[in-house]
């Protein structure tokens, strides 16, 4: 176990904060022992992957655990490959591992930063694909009982950018994830930016190259401008809301969902509040993609970025009467903060 306290290089917003202690966990046993110690000493802790979906508002007065449990184990039958993957594997490393071994299926999720465990918590998705579509099971440590248990996909309560692990952040620690990748590959090209590709001749590698180009074209490099990608979720609303908005904004993009509801684009709403490039202190709305808030010169505090997010939120409410929900987790001195405490309007 390695120990340190500085968190700036451990969160992609590059917010300069500290924790009481940072411990790297490489195996299940270490995690279990640390859990027991924390329970006995009445300590609290935060499990972190790459820090690519958190915003630290202030110094964290607890222990940060970096989950680095590794391992990619593959079995197969005639219809699918089955992957048993450590929560501490880098997500993009896993994607490229499967592509190099001719196991296509994860290519639309290429270049999403973070680790496998955090990807499950967030139910990451991009370009028409969500991780939950491939999830078979999740092996977790029950932090209430100290037992290792297996939750199957239907028990994980996956929704758009949600899961049981996000709703019960301090109940489970993810150890391993089980994925199923079907051998009968069907490319997903329905998302804007991919529709021009030829369904009959496209290869997984071509999809990856296209998505890499699209992502680097519109998303900032967190090494230069700290960010977490999309700060807000795309709002899902009833069609009557869209019908009302169409009377005033005939060009508003919207997408019907399987349950009959309609998804709007948060980036479009923010951009149409004329907020692209808006600067507040050391934080700003990225000039190429309004859904991304950035630490402009790597000097912003967490509260500055949160203030910018609140400003954006209020502008969207005032103009469209739509209340955006953050994708990012807000972390205060003693743990996660309910975003409703910040976004009150």
Swiss-Prot record:
It is an enzyme of class 1 (oxidoreductase). Its cofactor is FAD. It catalyses: UDP-N-acetyl-alpha-D-muramate + NADP(+) = UDP-N-acetyl-3-O-(1-carboxyvinyl)-alpha-D-glucosamine + NADPH + H(+). The active site is at 161, 230 (proton donor), 327. InterPro entries: FAD-bd_PCMH (IPR016166), FAD-bd_PCMH-like_sf (IPR036318), FAD-bd_PCMH_sub1 (IPR016167), FAD-bd_PCMH_sub2 (IPR016169), MurB (IPR003170), MurB_C (IPR011601), MurB_C_sf (IPR036635), Oxid_FAD_bind_N (IPR006094). Residues 15-218 form the FAD-binding PCMH-type domain. The keyword Iron-sulfur does not apply. One of its GO terms (biological process) is peptidoglycan biosynthetic process. Gene3D superfamilies: 3.30.465.10, UDP-N-acetylenolpyruvoylglucosamine reductase, C-terminal domain, Uridine Diphospho-n-acetylenolpyruvylglucosamine Reductase, domain 2. The keyword Glycoprotein does not apply. One of its GO terms (molecular function) is UDP-N-acetylmuramate dehydrogenase activity. Its EC number is 1.3.1.98. Pathway: Cell wall biogenesis; peptidoglycan biosynthesis. One of its GO terms (cellular component) is cytosol. Keywords: Cell cycle, Cell division, Cell shape, Cell wall biogenesis/degradation, Cytoplasm, FAD, Flavoprotein, NADP, Oxidoreductase, Peptidoglycan synthesis. It is found in: Cytoplasm. Belongs to the MurB family. HAMAP family: MurB (MF_00037). Cell wall formation. This is UDP-N-acetylenolpyruvoylglucosamine reductase. It comes from Blochmanniella floridana.
């Amino acid at each position: 176990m390695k120990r340190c306290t500085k968190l700036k290089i451990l969160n992609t917003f590059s917010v300069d904060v500290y924790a009481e202690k940072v411990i790297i966990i490489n195996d299940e046993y270490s995690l279990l022992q640390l859990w027991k110690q924390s329970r006995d000493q009445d300590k609290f802790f935060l499990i972190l992957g790459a820090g690519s979906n958190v915003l630290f508002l202030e110094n964290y007065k607890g222990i940060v655990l970096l989950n680095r449990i590794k391992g990619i184990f593959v079995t197969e039958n005639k219809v699918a490959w089955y992957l048993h993957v450590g929560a501490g594997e880098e997500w993009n490393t896993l994607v490229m591992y499967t592509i190099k071994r001719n196991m296509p299926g994860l290519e639309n999720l290429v270049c999403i930063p973070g680790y496998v465990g955090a990807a499950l918590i967030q139910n990451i998705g991009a370009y028409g694909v969500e991780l939950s579509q491939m999830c078979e099971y999740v092996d977790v440590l029950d932090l209430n009982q100290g037992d290792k248990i297996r939750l199957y996909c239907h028990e994980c309560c996956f929704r758009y950018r949600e899961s049981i692990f996000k709703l019960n952040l301090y109940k489970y620690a993810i150890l391993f994830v089980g994925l199923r990748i079907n051998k009968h590959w069907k490319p997903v090209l329905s998302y804007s930016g991919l529709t021009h590709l030829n369904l009959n001749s496209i290869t997984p590698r071509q999809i990856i190259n296209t998505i890499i180009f699209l992502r680097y074209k519109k998303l900032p490099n967190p090494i230069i401008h700290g960010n977490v990608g999309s700060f807000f979720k795309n709002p899902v609303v009833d069609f009557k809301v869209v019908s009302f908005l169409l009377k005033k904004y005939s060009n508003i993009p919207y997408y019907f969902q399987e349950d009959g509801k309609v998804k709007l684009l948060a980036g479009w709403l923010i951009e149409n509040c004329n907020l692209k490039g808006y600067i507040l202190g050391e934080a700003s709305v990225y000039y190429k993609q309004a859904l991304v808030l950035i630490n402009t010169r790597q000097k912003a505090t967490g509260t500055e970025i949160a203030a910018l997010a609140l400003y954006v939120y209020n502008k969207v409410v005032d103009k469209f009467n739509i209340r955006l929900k953050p994708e990012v987790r807000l972390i205060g001195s003693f743990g996660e903060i309910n975003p409703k405490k910040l976004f009150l309007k």
